[in-house]
């Protein structure tokens, strides 16, 4: 009898097809997130669970899933999962690093360019008919923004995504500053990046991109005090997690001109609506789509499947998050 896996959203078919060869697969096909009560019902008889960032996988879920042996998160981040509790119960947790790195780094630069060059504002100007109504073909002071070439970029968080952002910055001949919990000496040599304390990165950079995981240390690390350190011409881009930035302080910074603009792909709560923030024309907003490319999402689905198939075969999953769980339970659905 095949082990049963429940997938909380319709991921790309390539991953589902791989899983169907080895598992009994059930997929939540609706566009909306699975309701909490329905999730608790569905996990009662599953051996494996594929989850999205929008699902909170905590003690309550584990208590309702006596057969659950592995949770495969369809994301690189896993702050939606109580990993400590999973480990205590001998439940393996995996994620999808690397495969979405380029897509997310691309999106960071898309937000940076869109904000620096008023792309969205210009688009609205044309679509609304305002350009036609003005009857002016071109004006030397319209939509003045900032060039990226030769400027200083500050990258907060210098893991895979942070370093991929730095590689793109090299193409713009930018000076690269970074802040990370640990020095990355090899990356410094490869990319010509310079380590600085966080406060110095904020002070010196023309553009700041946030690429840190959400932890106790990074929660609201960009607050009013630190926003005031930035240049009034600076642009902040957040492709990390919404709670890395104090939204109220950011709104104040954008309104009062402490910084020139912001590009945000992540928010404190998702889905998100904030009339005060959304009314500002110096911020570009996208709905958490950093990894939204055909290539990345299919690669994520394949990696999810590879993790589950490896576990089923008694092998350590390729991207195991909680490696200490191996001491508690060997991989495989028959292991106790």
UniProtKB/Swiss-Prot annotation:
Residues annotated as catalytic: 241, 270, 288
Localization terms from the record: Cytoplasm
Top EC class for this record: oxidoreductase
Keywords assigned by UniProt, alphabetized: Cytoplasm, NAD, Oxidoreductase
Reactions it catalyzes: glycolate + NAD(+) = glyoxylate + NADH + H(+)
Residue numbers binding NADP(+): 158-161, 180-182, 239-241, 288-290
SUPFAM superfamilies: Formate/glycerate dehydrogenase catalytic domain-like (SSF52283), NAD(P)-binding Rossmann-fold domains (SSF51735)
GO molecular function terms listed in the Swiss-Prot or TrEMBL record: glyoxylate reductase (NADH) activity; glyoxylate reductase (NADPH) activity; hydroxypyruvate reductase [NAD(P)H] activity; NAD binding
EC id: 1.1.1.26
InterPro entries in the cross-refs: D-isomer_2-hydroxyacid_DH, D-isomer_2_OHA_DH_cat_dom, D-isomer_DH_CS, D-isomer_DH_CS1, D-isomer_DH_NAD-bd, Glyoxylate_reductase_GyaR, NAD(P)-bd_dom_sf
Record-level GO cellular component terms: cytosol
Protein family according to the UniProt entry: Belongs to the D-isomer specific 2-hydroxyacid dehydrogenase family. GyaR subfamily.
Subunit structure of this chain's protein: Homodimer.
Name of this protein: Glyoxylate reductase
Source organism (scientific name): Pyrococcus furiosus (strain ATCC 43587 / DSM 3638 / JCM 8422 / Vc1)
